[in-house]
Amino acid sequence: MKIIVDRMEAMIAETGNTGFHFVDEAAPPALLRKLAEEILARKLVVTYWTNVRFDKTYTAELCYLLSKSGCIAVSGGLEVASPRVLKLINKGVTIESATECMRNLSENGIMVHTYLMYGFPTQTEKELYDSLGRVRDLFAEGLIHSAFWHRYAMTCHSPSGRNPESVLARHMTQIPNIFANNEIPFEVDNEPDWSRFTEGLNVATYNYMRQTGFDVPLKRWFR
C-alpha cells in the first residue's frame, strides 16, 4: 500500500494534480481501508474515486474513514434490481445489502453512481418495472446520485455465456469480428421487446437524478 501512496505523492509533485481515479473493476474494501489509513497517516490532501462492489463490508465506520481520506465518489453495479435475477446471475449481493452499503456511503458524503441492466434472459416486464421502482426509491432517499442503464450483453466468459441453457437462452451464429469476439448473440423464446424500454428508462433516470418525477407512475415513462 505504501507503494501506491508513494506513487500518488510522486504524481502530485510532478503534475500538481491531487485527484485520482482508481480503475479496479471492484476495489477490495480491505485494500481501500489500508489506502485511507496511509493517506491520513501522511496527512495528504487528495480526492479520489473508484469502482466498488456494493456489499456489507462497507460499514458506516469504513465509509467515514474513506470519506475522511478524500474519497468523493464510487461507482458499482446494482445491475438488475430484482432479487430473483440477481440470484440468477450470481451477483453475490442482495438488494438489502446493496442498499445498506449505499446508505453508509452516501451518509458519509460519498457520491454513489450505479450501473443498471435490463433484458437479462427470463427477466419479465414486471421485474423491469419493479427494478425501476427500486431505483426511483434509492434516488428519492438520496442513497444514489447517478445511474446508467445498459442492455444486457451475453459474453463468452460469463456463466450465462458458457451455459446459456441455464437461463433458457440459445447461442446464435456469430459473425467473426477481426477486433474481438467476446459478445455472443443469443435468442430467448417469448422475450419482451426490450428496445421499447430504452428511452423510458433513460428519461425516468434523468428525472430522478434531478429529484423530479418521483410521483410519475412507472408505466407512464414508456408511453
Locate predicted features:
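Short catalytic/ligand-binding loop motif for oxyanion handling, primarily in non-cytosolic enzymes
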Residues: P29-L31, P121-T124, T155-S158
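Structural beta-sheet core signal
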Residues: T50, T114-L116, W149
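C-terminal structural cap/anchor segments
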Residues: L105, V112-M117, K126-E127, S131-R134
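Conserved SAM/AdoMet-binding glycine-rich loop
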Residues: V5-M111, F120
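C-terminal accessory regions of radical SAM enzymes
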Residues: K126-R223
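Hydrophobic, well-ordered secondary-structure elements that form the walls
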Residues: F22, G76, T114, V135, ...
